[in-house]
Amino acid sequence: MANEQNEQSQDLSSEQTTQDHEQTQTEGVEQGAEISVEDLKAQIGKLEESLKLEKARTANAVYEAEKVKERAEREADTAKKFALEKFAKSLLDSVDNLERAIQAAGKEKTPLLEGVELTLKSLTTTLEKFDVVSVDTTNGFNAELHQAVGIDPNAKSGEIGNVLQKGYTLSGRLLRPAMVTVGQ
């Protein structure tokens, strides 16, 4: 019987130990749960900050990419405009020759003269489509657009007397200055 009581005592002691152990585990889990929640909240805060930082970096990268794209488009437009410069300069000689042919023909309208005039008109229209336009010589002498090659005694001071050769610009940039005579 003492043996039975001893076994019952051990069983009770074992049950008590098991209950204490379970209670300790439950408290540990609860404390662990509290710590885990706090840790998770801290991690969430860190992740939110990291997300904000990455969003800002992404927005900055998108902004920079747009700026690079815009600059490349501008440079391509500029290159396209001025890539025609050498070609346009070559065509100006043809325009000059056609104008000289028209002047040399006189006032008599012949089919040949009409053909030359139509060719000149077609060529100048094509040049204007690509923003190649003649320099204005009606508003007086401008050293940036005109080259004075002589003096015209009949013209007023600062005025253009005769235009010896037309000047041209390409998209506002001077291709060739107008060769003119000016008054004293």
Swiss-Prot record:
<feature type="compositionally biased region" description="Polar residues">
    <location>
        <begin position="1"/>
        <end position="14"/>
    </location>
</feature>
<comment type="subunit">
    <text>Homodimer.</text>
</comment>
<dbReference type="InterPro" id="IPR000740">
    <property type="entry name" value="GrpE"/>
</dbReference>
<protein>
    <recommendedName>
        <fullName>Protein GrpE</fullName>
    </recommendedName>
</protein>
<keyword id="KW-0963">Cytoplasm</keyword>
<dbReference type="GO" id="GO:0051087">
    <property type="term" value="F:protein-folding chaperone binding"/>
</dbReference>
<comment type="function">
    <text>Participates actively in the response to hyperosmotic and heat shock by preventing the aggregation of stress-denatured proteins, in association with DnaK and GrpE. It is the nucleotide exchange factor for DnaK and may function as a thermosensor. Unfolded proteins bind initially to DnaJ; upon interaction with the DnaJ-bound protein, DnaK hydrolyzes its bound ATP, resulting in the formation of a stable complex. GrpE releases ADP from DnaK; ATP binding to DnaK triggers the release of the substrate protein, thus completing the reaction cycle.</text>
</comment>
<keyword id="KW-0346">Stress response</keyword>
<dbReference type="GO" id="GO:0000774">
    <property type="term" value="F:adenyl-nucleotide exchange factor activity"/>
</dbReference>
<dbReference type="InterPro" id="IPR009012">
    <property type="entry name" value="GrpE_head"/>
</dbReference>
<dbReference type="Pfam" id="PF01025">
    <property type="entry name" value="GrpE"/>
</dbReference>
<dbReference type="InterPro" id="IPR013805">
    <property type="entry name" value="GrpE_coiled_coil"/>
</dbReference>
<feature type="region of interest" description="Disordered">
    <location>
        <begin position="1"/>
        <end position="35"/>
    </location>
</feature>
<dbReference type="GO" id="GO:0006457">
    <property type="term" value="P:protein folding"/>
</dbReference>
<keyword id="KW-0143">Chaperone</keyword>
<dbReference type="GO" id="GO:0042803">
    <property type="term" value="F:protein homodimerization activity"/>
</dbReference>
<comment type="similarity">
    <text>Belongs to the GrpE family.</text>
</comment>
<dbReference type="GO" id="GO:0005829">
    <property type="term" value="C:cytosol"/>
</dbReference>
<dbReference type="GO" id="GO:0051082">
    <property type="term" value="F:unfolded protein binding"/>
</dbReference>
